[in-house]
Amino acid sequence: MSQRQPQSPNQTLISTTNDTESSSSVVPNDSTNKRRTGDNSPGIEALCAIYITYAVIISVGILGNAILIKVFFKTKSMQTVPNIFITSLAFGDLLLLLTCVPVDVTHYLAEGWLFGRIGCKVLSFIRLTSVGVSVFTLTILSADRYKAVVKPLERQPPNAILKTCAKAGCIWIMSMIIALPEAIFSNVYTFQDPDKNVTFKACASYPVSERLLQEIHSLLCFLVFYIIPLSIISVYYSLIARTLYKSTLNIPTEEQRHARKQIESRKRIAKTVLVLVALFALCWLPNHLLYLYRSFTSQTYMDSSTVHLFVTIISRILAFSNSCVNPFALYWLSNTFQQHFKAQLFCCKAGRPDPTAANTPLDNLAVMGRVPGAASTQMSEISVSPFTGCSVKKEDDRV
């Protein structure tokens, strides 16, 4: 394919091609880490480390999310309102791990975009849809947990499961609608680094020359997929923590042993939620800051410095890692899921669930998944945190 030459030595060449495509900027396309950049490209040792890291993320993430989904569908007691959202989150993570993460590895293997114009648009759509499903599901989960804390005695209607499935479906539809413009405008562009006199193709949402569009796009991504949902989640869980703390002050020390254990459990859960919020912010903040940096700094040429390359790799690994940690956070925090996980992983009979799980005190509805249509004293063992899709422990578990 013929390429136009730059008009001046310092001008970046950008030309739309017919056989390449763009990637979602929520996980910015890495156009600077190719081996073509010469001296600042990763060495053999670094490339091996990158390949191994990606392989671990893909294999561990697929295994964990697949088991989580299987446990949900095979275990009736796990089919609670919060676990529907968790399973939806697992589907979104699995979609990302099966498509976009393997494609991202090719940035370090090939000299340019390999998947054509259609592939670029499809992958951009999938990537942004998955990110939207994750972020918006976590936000809805935070609202669900807040409601459970404020109204622990409220009985869920018999059609709660159906309504929750509808909500999860709406999240997917909304995420796809938001991702649609990304797929429409994404394309493959040819870039030139005038300092090294090399050209390469990359999938991008907008041409580098469209400075204003990049700035608007990066700000919108930062607000819609990070600042706004994280702010909402932070408000909900600040209120949850405050409610849990105040409730512990109102229970006399002479209460029965069971109530005292419940108080300690609620304190541990409040602390765990704060940690999960920090983990969520940590995984996504570098990625968004990197895209903002690329959009608002000089773009007359691609930054191929070693520091920029290192930050890019780390930010992408952190973002993709968020899709594989949820099942293992759930394994760590939920004794019942741990038993089912082991049963599926090692093909053995799952251990008998803790009988106290079906008779948990009403106060623990704040962090327990209530069984729709059941008496108010009946509830499932699983409870969730919205940031990793993981369950919070039963009162006899330890955080």
Curated annotation (Swiss-Prot):
Its main location: membrane. Residues 64-82, 144-163, 242-272, 334-399 are cytoplasmic. The keyword Glycoprotein applies. The chain crosses the membrane at residues 42-63, 83-103, 122-143, 164-184, 221-241, 273-293, 314-333. GO terms for cellular component: plasma membrane. Keywords: Cell membrane, Disulfide bond, G-protein coupled receptor, Glycoprotein, Lipoprotein, Membrane, Palmitate, Receptor, Transducer, Transmembrane, Transmembrane helix. Pfam families: 7tm_1. Disulfide bonds join C120-C203. It is found in: Cell membrane. It is a multi-pass membrane protein. One of its GO terms (molecular function) is bombesin receptor activity. Belongs to the G-protein coupled receptor 1 family. Role in sperm cell division, maturation, or function. This receptor mediates its action by association with G proteins that activate a phosphatidylinositol-calcium second messenger system. This is Bombesin receptor subtype-3. The gene is BRS3.
